[in-house]
């Protein structure tokens, strides 16, 4: 009997379950479309703020409100733990499609912000469902490779998704970019709904019993690390598009080209992390990524006037972020092994707070000083993240 071949077989051998190898590629593509919708706005904030006739810092304040509202993420994690994994993932994707449609059709900035908020909430439900699905099917020691594979969707969402949406925006408007994203993610929601087994792991009695378990105290070091890591990412991601437009005269098409290059950097980091994190160790790999962010941010504070140097440093900065986040996710999902959704939800709440703070601080600092101050703040955040991971390692008996 001929063994069925799957796309993921290039990365996962027979020691991984057939269920994992059969579906991980589909779920990765689904997450690519969700990440494209989620990541689309920041590079084009200048165009969006112009359309609504408001300043960049005011739009940053509006985005901060959406991030603060995402403080409900630990509750969402507990809720998702009770759902069928297929329900959480397919439902999350279809909800993202609806939210992106709201953003595309928004008549005012506050309706736009509502759409962005709903995209974030729905994406969170999908991501928690995916992380829990991986926990259900893959042993912890092998989880880094599978999560690394699914996490390539973060980079590909930028490389393929945001680039395509940006090119549509350059030919029409940013609203049609969202429309394309909404259609793509809806298609993948239907694919996930039809391909995954309906009886796949649900919020069984086991899950309902164990979600009451508390986060271990040392797990809050990972909460802090996620706060600093996401803050470091957000401070540049919400400002680099405006920097390119103001400093070097980039158009939406030019920014899309830069987004493509940054996505390639992130993809390199994702693939490398997927191959190396389980071997190097998750904590060590997370620190390695932050160790790239720190010098890149500091050098960008002085090299931001040179287009080539600035773009290279920006690429290294985001490469370090991607390597760190991929390495930290399996660590986060295992903090409460019997309730991965709740543990990951608490940690991602830290990331939400980090993004919220820098949505306001980063855009306000850019409006007043330019890109150099946000870059410096990002470097300091990377140092804070390294400190949190070191502290976690010292309070954890066994590190994997």
Predicted regions span which residues?
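Helix-to-loop junctions at the C-terminal end of transmembrane segments
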Residues: 73-84, 269-281, 366
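Helix-loop-helix hairpin linking two adjacent transmembrane segments in secondary transporters
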Residues: 150-196
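Cytoplasmic helix-loop-helix junction between adjacent transmembrane helices
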Residues: 117-152
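Central cavity-lining transmembrane alpha-helices of secondary-active solute carriers
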Residues: 64-77, 260-269
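C-terminal transmembrane helical hairpin of 12-TM major facilitator-type secondary transporters
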Residues: 283-328
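A late C-terminal transmembrane helix in Major Facilitator Superfamily
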Residues: 338-368
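Conserved MFS/SLC helix-loop-helix module at the cytosolic interface between two early adjacent transmembrane helices
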Residues: 72-107
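Extracytoplasmic gate region of multi-pass secondary transporters
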Residues: 42, 221-260
